[in-house]
Amino acid sequence: KYVVNLICFPMFIVFISDLFNKINGYGGKVYFDVFKSIFSNFLPFLFISILISLLTLILTALFNDSKKAKIVILVLTLILLFVNDIKYSIMGIPIELTDVGYLNPDNMNMMGTATSSIGLWIIKTIIKSLIYILLGIIIVLLDKHHNLKFNDLKKRIIIPFVSLVILIIPFTFNTHINNFILKNIYRMSKSEILATSEIDQLYYEEGYFQGMYLDKLGNKFVLPDEYSRKTAQNAINEAVSKSNKSSWKKANVVILLSETFSDPQRLSGIEYDRELMPNIKSYEKDDDKIVTDLLVNPYGGTSVNSEFEVLTGVSLSFLNVGYIGYTQYYNDNLKGKNQSLINEFNNNGYETMYLTPWGETSYRSKYVYSILGADKTIYGNELKGKNKGTYYSDESLMNDIYDQLKTTSKGNYKFIMAASGQNHFPYLDKYKESDYDVNVKSTKYDKEATNMFRSYAQGIYDADKALNQLYKKIQNLDTPTIVVMFGDHQPFMGKKDNTSDYLQNSYFNTNDEIINDIRLHTTKAVILANFKLDTSDNLEFINSSYLGAYVLNKMDLKVSDYFKFVDY
């Protein structure tokens, strides 16, 4: 009974979960890949099996019936695997332990909207689920000969208590425990995890649950090798001593995250009947505006990571793929103790605020901005503008931003961090025909892909138009005002068969892997104002983690040593 319930069953769960996650077809090589990950990484497999065994013990004692315990674990595992398939197919990344923080009304509503992109892959997921259910039924039916019960009351109390204590220890993510598990079970270093190019690589190489746990371990901050506080302070002191004098005057500052703003005209195979960014192309010729390529951390989603980098100057390249600063870094202990543009502008007497059509619970947004110290936050339920297509229009958002700027004056400045949503995925059947200004002149793609390309292009056209409308409006302000607009990431444009003609475009698939990676993580950034900006730096590109610091250090403001160092 003990062998079946506490050894065989947990190992089956780990095995079947990895198989479920890896299957892209029927049978064949995938089956052996699962065995390969088990035998080449046996200790992680054994470690996760022990954790599931402890959970089985706890539930068995709770129900006093191992059959019920196994049913609960089978059902929970199936739900996890099913949702993982959905998330991976829609967003391109697997489920993580931190996704518990994603389960809130605003994020669930956004994912519900995205289900219009669900396609034929869901059939494969359903078939896998049915096979899983059949195997689960067989296990439960055979369990009548191996049902484990604890008739002794002391055992029913002591066993789950001890099991729970042991189970909790690996999930405290204490630094010493992390290092022990990494070194002795996974036999990996922090740098090896950081070298992983994609989060699903961990899941594939280590196994499903094994990779999920390793991903969580890798997200923990650790001091770099040979770290020295003295050396770090010397570097900061050098940056401060050599910091440049400001060349821009004190002004209102608007930093706008423009959803998926990049230049789709760089891609081959499709042509449009007009220039998609006529105003920004015009700005490029002006000597008082900055138009540059922006290197961003995410691809296809997780906009808040670009927002995080711009606001904090922290590069997420020091953390493994999949880390989300808003959901994993901020806590009550950091209130008043964090570095951000919000804090910098607060220290310079600005009113600071965040404005977006998204919801306040999305990625814990309202909580995070309270930790950052924003004076005011405005979310979608407070905005009165119109949607265009599925989401709140960029034109309406620009009007909302200008309404906030109208009340400013010299000595009464505002810093506004804003985020748009109109050009968020899904792109299929997003607009009514009457919503389009952009038409496709020629295309090599099928109807579905062409429809998505056109929807995305319309979003870029509208973002360019809305930015220019705001630019014209701020010319009427007496208060100096700077507007920074940046794209958060390239679009995630998946077809219903789970392929992406956008991602497979030759622009992203040259013979140079470095160029391919750079292009996948390149968007646009624009800086303009209602006064003449010194643009002598001639920026060709900038990383998102430097963008906020760059603007801050250009202005006539009191800047912390930290942000002087970031801009150095």
Which stretches of residues belong to each language-model region?
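Solvent-exposed soluble domains appended to multi-pass membrane proteins
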Residues: 237-248, 255-258, 263-568
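Membrane-interface segments at or immediately adjacent to transmembrane helices
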Residues: 172-255
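Membrane-proximal soluble helical/coiled-coil segments
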Residues: 111-112, 118-121, 125, 232-242, ...
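Conserved acidic functional residues
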Residues: 130, 229, 259
